[in-house]
């Protein structure tokens, strides 16, 4: 059997608060790598504390890519990510370094590693109509309407996931075809890499829940509310009719802080809601990760030496 001459890449996935960022840096330092963020919120400038964005020292220790590349009032799609990540990978490989892709945004990983079907681009007018509909009738109602025209996609989307409900309805209303129908088309070219997939996740869920609660408290202590207030008073965001519909402002933690600043609930309720929303995000991420059948799972607190051995063996193949 001929040797696989494709460039190697490490894919490090996991739920939020599992310790991926530091492990990615450790791997990069040991094996001459560069980190590519696979996170739909880290792309935004100004969202630092609430995203646990790698700090300046971490980013100076090894090169990082696709962090702070757009403004929080802009949109950034999975297709945008796949394009930019391919460019970053090409650059890293040309330098003779190891691409290390790390994050928790499953759609971004799928877009890059498996490819995307061609679909209609975003349509601002249709999107605004859907948003107005949701404000009037609720996202749960729109989820029901989606099920009437695209039962397959609706079954994959939770009724509390407005961004995906909106996109699925937008695709249908723009094209007259369901998203599931579009997804039956041949995928765009897959990434020509030899990939090792690792999942970093605590073995016991209560450990992850503890880490989530501890981290959200630290975010609040470190100034998350001030960060959100700076975002909401920025002229480009403040001038918007519905700023909370921005993908950046729908991010876990940011929406809850915004609502607290609007006096919708107390500081204690903010903490409780922020932790609950983060736990729900982690649950969705774990559901997706269980479908990654070719990934190897590791516990962040006990498996450091095992991870090193697996990476070493993969790179020496």
Curated annotation (Swiss-Prot):
Required cofactor(s): Mg(2+)
Enzyme Commission identifier(s): 2.5.1.75
Listed GO MF terms: ATP binding; tRNA dimethylallyltransferase activity
Region ranges (Interaction with substrate tRNA): 39-42, 163-167
Site keyed Interaction with substrate tRNA: positions: 105, 127
Binding sites annotated in the UniProt record for ATP: 14-21
Protein name from the UniProt record: tRNA dimethylallyltransferase
Organism, as annotated: Xylella fastidiosa (strain 9a5c)
């Amino acid at each position: 059997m001929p040797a696989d001459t494709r460039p190697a890449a490490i894919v490090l996935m996991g739920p939020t608060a599992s310790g991926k960022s530091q492990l990615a840096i450790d791997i990069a330092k040991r094996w001459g790598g560069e980190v590519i963020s696979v996170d739909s919120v880290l792309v935004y400038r100004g969202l630092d504390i609430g995203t646990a964005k790698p700090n300046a020292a971490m980013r100076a220790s090894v090169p990082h890519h696709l962090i702070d590349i757009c403004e929080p009032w802009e949109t950034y799609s999975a297709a945008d990510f796949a394009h930019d990540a391919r460019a970053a990978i090409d650059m890293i490989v040309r330098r003779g370094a190891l691409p290390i892709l790390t994050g928790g945004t499953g759609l971004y990983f799928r877009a890059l590693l498996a490819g995307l079907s061609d679909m209609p681009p975003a349509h601002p007018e249709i999107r605004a109509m859907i948003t107005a509909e949701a404000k009037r009738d609720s996202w749960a109602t729109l989820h029901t309407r989606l099920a009437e025209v695209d039962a397959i996609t609706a079954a994959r989307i939770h009724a509390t996931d407005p961004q995906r409900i909106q996109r699925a309805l937008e695709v249908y209303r723009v094209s007259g075809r369901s998203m599931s129908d579009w997804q039956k088309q041949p995928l765009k070219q897959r990434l020509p890499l030899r990939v090792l997939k690792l999942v970093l996740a605590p073995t016991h869920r209560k450990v992850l829940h503890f880490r989530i609660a501890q981290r959200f408290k630290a975010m609040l202590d470190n100034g998350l509310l001030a960060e959100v207030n700076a975002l909401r008073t920025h002229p480009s965001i403040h001038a918007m009719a519905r700023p909370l519909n921005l993908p950046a402002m729908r991010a876990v933690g940011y929406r809850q802080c915004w609502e607290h600043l609007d006096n919708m609930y107390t500081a204690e309720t903010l903490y409780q809601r922020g932790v609950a929303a983060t736990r729900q995000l982690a649950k969705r991420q774990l559901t997706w990760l269980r479908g990654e059948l070719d990934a190897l799972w590791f516990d962040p607190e006990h498996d450091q030496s095992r991870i090193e051995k697996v990476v070493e063996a993969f790179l020496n193949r």
